[in-house]
Each structure stands twice: as C-alpha cells, then as structure tokens.
C-alpha cells in the first residue's frame, strides 16, 4: 500500500472555472488520469486544503477523492489538551488554570493557541518574571484573537453543503462532517 498526500490541493487541482489562466488545467488533467488508472491498486490519495471552494468538482467523483472530512476547530477538551502540550516545560505560575484558558479560547485553532502561549511567555519576559502568570495569558487573549470568525465558520458551512451535494451519496463509505 502507498499513501500519497497533497497538501494545499487547491493549488494543484484548481477548478477550471476559477483558474483564469488555465495554467493548472494540464496538472489537473494528469492527476485525474493517474487517479483513474490507480483505482484498483493499493494507493490512497489524501488531499488537504483550507480552500475547498477552489478544487475542481471532477476531483470529488467516485474513485478519486471519495471521502470529504471537514475538520472543525478544537472543542474545549481538545483545546485543553493542546494547551497542556504547548505549556509542557514552560515555567507556569501556580495561579494558572488551564481549564479557564481552554474555556475562553472558543474558535481558536491549534496555531492560535500556540500564538497565545508564545504571547504569554513574551509578556512574562517583558515583566522580567521567571514564571508565566494568569495575567500574562489574559493579556495574550487580548492580543491573540481566534482566526475562525462567525463569517469564516458560515463560509465553511456553506462550502460543506456545496461539496456534499457534489459527491454521490451511493457510496456507503462516504461521510461528511
């Protein structure tokens, strides 16, 4: 078996309609041909994108990219787990409640949480403190905002509905989130 991962799939499989210069059409055509030819082999193709609206619909037909997963931002428990990993080894003051930070970071991505932890560390350094306090995190929360806004969340929901209507529902293995 072989797993082929295409990160930023939208740059390789851009919709012919949205590719004004048609530069990617040759790449897209070749990818589609190769994916058709490998249908019976042990090759799994994974495409990753944060711009699903740019991917050509032909990539979403049976035998190509059969399963579409929309990865939601981390929930509160996941944010807590991420924060614990990010702060492991950081000199945290005794007054820090990581649960409170997880609660107050709704719509933060893992990258947003990493920025928050770095910001809290910088705040502690600016105070010449050896420990990162809850106030350092509170200041960080004012500076580091979540990258997923209501508008972005709605946009992804709309795209999810659009993409879900393209993929044939006949395959029992196809699922959506």
Predicted segment positions?
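C-terminal engagement/docking regions of AAA+ P-loop ATPases
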Residues: 97-117, 125-177
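Walker A/P-loop NTP-binding motif of AAA+ ATPase domains
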Residues: 1-108, 120
